């Protein structure tokens, strides 16, 4: 513990040292109800063993106190790899290694395994946020790591980090906006004819395959449902020769601690569950997160992971559906490109200069890509 900028600074290895009331109280001041920054979600990641020292995520949360009041905080991890981040810096690590330098460990401010934009520098005001950034920089110097990375902050926070000397990087995701549609057909009516026809054909294929779908709200999800979803989730990772990041204990924990934010879509055929999609939502935003299947049916992924959640958004008046990382195919289903941000600080001056030049070139490519995507707007009004 030390006193800096009129705040007491604590660096803790467990979120419980900050406490749920203090953490969620500070989060509530950020102006958006982001479920992934909630104590319940982060605590579930840690306590389930999904994001912990053994998996390469060593928590090192920073908390700034004004007296007994939590004035600022951020989720920070010491990492020895770049898995589960969705802002790719593997090439940077390779370049360090080729020059005989160590890229790991590094500091990462992010929600593990979650490419969702939201507040990262939690603070009661802009002055406390500025102090938090200074403490973050001091922490990097004290721990002698190669770099610090803040992933998916809102643009306002990203610009403040840029003003503090961080390098800014941008990316693209695809989000759907609810224009107060009366129903799914009203949404379809706004799309180009070809897009509308393709979506109806995809939904028809699923129905003709004898598949039915049911939506289960968080409080109604049974242990059997969770076991089945986890089986689907793990099966899909195995099919891609990958190791799943999350486990059954994590899913059960969020189901118990934040049921009002959970929706599970289960696909069944001949009375047997064959696939499932898990989304997380607030009153105004839905986030597509996890999908898996144990039996393949053409177009079922689109039905369970996109069309069912879209219908849910329309029924519940949810304004935004964030589709997750990557995926131009989402545009054909009414999702539009949205810019995301990350901020990076590298200790090695020569590499910092080289990466700054790389990011300048990359930013030009992202601008061109956004222009190209916007020209392919799937809605009828854009086509004239």
What does each model-identified segment do?
Residues 1-384:
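N-acyltransferase acceptor-side catalytic subdomain
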């Amino acid at each position: 513990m030390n006193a800096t900028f009129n705040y007491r600074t604590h660096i803790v290895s467990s979120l419980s040292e900050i406490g749920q009331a203090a953490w969620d109280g500070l989060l509530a001041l950020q102006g958006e109800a982001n479920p992934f920054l909630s104590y319940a979600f982060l605590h579930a990641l840690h306590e389930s063993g999904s994001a912990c020292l053994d998996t390469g995520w060593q928590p090192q949360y920073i908390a700034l106190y004004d007296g007994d009041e939590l004035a600022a905080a951020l989720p920070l991890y010491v990492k020895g790899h770049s898995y589960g981040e969705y802002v790719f810096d593997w090439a940077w690590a390779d370049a360090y290694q080729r020059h005989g330098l160590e890229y790991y460990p590094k500091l990462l401010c992010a929600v593990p395994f979650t490419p969702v934009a939201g507040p990262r520098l939690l603070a009661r005001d802009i002055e406390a946020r500025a102090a938090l950034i200074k403490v973050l920089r001091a922490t990097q110097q004290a721990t002698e790591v190669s770099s610090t990375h803040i992933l998916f902050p809102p643009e306002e926070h990203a610009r403040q980090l840029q003003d503090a000397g961080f390098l800014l990087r941008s990316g693209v995701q695809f989000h759907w906006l609810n224009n107060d549609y009366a129903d799914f057909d009203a949404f379809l009516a706004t799309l180009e004819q070809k897009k509308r026809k393709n979506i109806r054909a995809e939904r028809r294929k699923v129905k003709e395959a004898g598949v039915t779908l049911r939506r289960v709200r968080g409080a109604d999800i049974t242990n059997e449902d969770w076991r089945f979803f986890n089986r689907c989730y793990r099966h899909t990772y195995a099919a891609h020769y990958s190791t799943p990041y999350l486990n059954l204990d994590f899913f059960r924990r969020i189901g118990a601690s934040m049921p009002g934010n959970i929706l599970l879509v289960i696909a069944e055929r001949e009375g047997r569950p064959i696939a499932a999609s898990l989304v997380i939502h607030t009153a105004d935003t839905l986030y597509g997160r996890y999908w898996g299947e144990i039996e393949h049916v053409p177009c079922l992924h689109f039905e369970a992971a996109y069309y069912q959640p879209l219908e849910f958004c329309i029924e519940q008046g949810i304004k935004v559906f964030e589709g997750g990382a990557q995926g131009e195919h989402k545009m054909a289903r009414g999702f539009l490109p949205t810019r995301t941000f990350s901020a990076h600080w590298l200790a090695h001056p020569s590499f910092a200069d080289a990466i700054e030049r790389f990011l300048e070139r990359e930013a030009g490519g992202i601008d061109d890509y956004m222009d190209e995507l916007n020209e392919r707007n799937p809605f009828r009004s854009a086509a004239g």
